[in-house]
Amino acid sequence: MAPKISISLNPPYNGEFYSSNDQMSGIVSLQLTKALSIRKISVILKGFSETLTKIDQEYMFQQNGMMMPGQDNKSFHTLMKFEQRVFPPDNVWNALDGSSKPFKVKPGSYNYSFQFDKFPRKPECLKNHTAKTVAFVTRNNARLPPTFNSHWQEFNKIDNLDLYFYSFGKVIYMVQVQIELGKSSSWFKPFHKLIREIETFEFIPEPKDLIVEPDEDDNEELNAFSNNSRGNSLVTNNEFFNSSNLKVPSKDVKVVNGVGYIKSDRNFSQANSILIENGDIRSRPVSSVTSTRQSTRLVNGMKVFPSTYKMGLPDGESNMRIEVRSRDLKQIYRKDYLFRSGSQNFDKVYVVMEGNIASLSKMQITPLKLQLNLLETTTYLSQGIANGNYSSLKLIEIDLNQLKSNKPLLDLNEIRENFDGSMFECELRLKDHPILRKLVFNEEDYRHRGNRLYSFKTCTIKRIFSLQLLIEWGINGIRKQSEVNIDPVQIFCQVREHVEAEALPRYVPPPTYTEMAS
């Protein structure tokens, strides 16, 4: 009967997942029903990422003039690997002086403890990156990535097509026990037999190591290849976006030491698989080009996120748009308030109008419904081919008029004009809505397709999020909809640390002393 091996990991410090400050430790239990020749027992702590990308048949036909099967491209990166021998002890191992003679271990139960150092900050695979490596990160901003898609390790057990393509990228961490048995005396079995047992675990770095830094454009060795594509007829999960293709403009491409690097992937909204070959970028022909990039500006120290488009008003001359103003909307932690006053997220929303003030004051403009979506873009890269997956999560959908309040959310009597009188604005007081002001982000620690909600970027996987605020309006009986996109937004699955100022010690008057008469 084969030996029975079990791995018991000590729980992480936060009780949920292992982080940068944890030291992986635990106990290996070995049960033998009969004597066994064992040379050594090792515990291996390792992590790796793997991606699989495809080029569809339409692209292959345009390049070669003939129908060819889709091409698979695979990539494998070792993120870390540490090994610790737990049997035999060091003094015995050193005394063997290189001898391969095994130990005869009697039947029974044996426990071996192990402990590793803290997790490294940078992945081990960086030392294998060459000048021709195409990656999403540079050597400077590469960090050890979090666990991702570790539940979907066998493709043949996935019956959902969207999830099937989504599972093409993985980051897996595990503890592996490896027992090396004694060499067989038979000449046709010259190698040591190995018995292995693995235990996967969830690792998520500290928030500072999860931040997706913008692509760098300097003279250092650039390994970043960023393809924020929206639409691949083969591998795109289009829960929200439509498929289309776009040729990447040559002015947005920089090649450094043979490495393809897209200087800014936010100048185009829809693209297909990108192929880098000999420093040249080749892609499928353009079928449509629709830019949805919103320009932002600063007002009184706050960043302004305008709506994607302006809405025409009934007088035929005036228009209105929505603006979200915030100092800190680019980062959202779990349990952050979204609309509450002082949250610096959606607590300052304004309706900005252009036109004749007399005409505007006569209009009936009422917010009817609100919907807030979290949009996920996950891109996998392998051998210069990038495939994208897209999905949307509805955070809240609410009828704004369901609960009546004493004061309307939008009061046009409070409209004010800017310094030159060309525009007028009025605050949309979503922070006063009794439901919205209590809404917090991801209170239940939701797992989307098996993964917690967090942004990250590593060599071959990039997962970014954006927020979409949709408001339905009633304007003189006509329904219209506004849209504001916050792109990108850094999402954390950790709860924000609130640093409270330490209270000053209470003043205690000093004791009084009297001179004693001599």
UniProtKB/Swiss-Prot annotation:
User: Where does this polypeptide localize?
Assistant: Cytoplasm
Chief site of localization: cytoplasm
What UniProt keywords are attached to this protein's entry? Cytoplasm, Endocytosis, Isopeptide bond, Ubl conjugation
Sorted alphabetically, which Gene3D superfamilies does this protein's record hold? 2.60.40.640
- Keyword Secreted applies: no
Q: Which residues form a coiled coil?
A: none
UniProt cross-references to InterPro entries, sorted A to Z: Arrestin-like_C
- A GO BP entry: endocytosis
Annotated signal peptide: none
Lineage, top-rank taxon, reads Eukaryota
Instruction: Provide a GO CC annotation, any one.
Output: cytoplasm
Show the cross-link location (Glycyl lysine isopeptide (Lys-Gly) (interchain with G-Cter in ubiquitin)).
K118
Q: How is it modified after translation?
A: Ubiquitinated by RSP5.
The function of this protein is: May regulate endocytosis by recruiting RSP5 ubiquitin ligase activity to specific plasma membrane proteins in response to extracellular stimuli.
The entry's family comment says: Belongs to the ART10 family.
Quaternary form?
Interacts with RSP5.
| Listed name of the protein | Arrestin-related trafficking adapter 10
Q: Please name the source species.
A: Saccharomyces cerevisiae (strain RM11-1a) (Baker's yeast)
The gene that this protein is the product of is: ART10
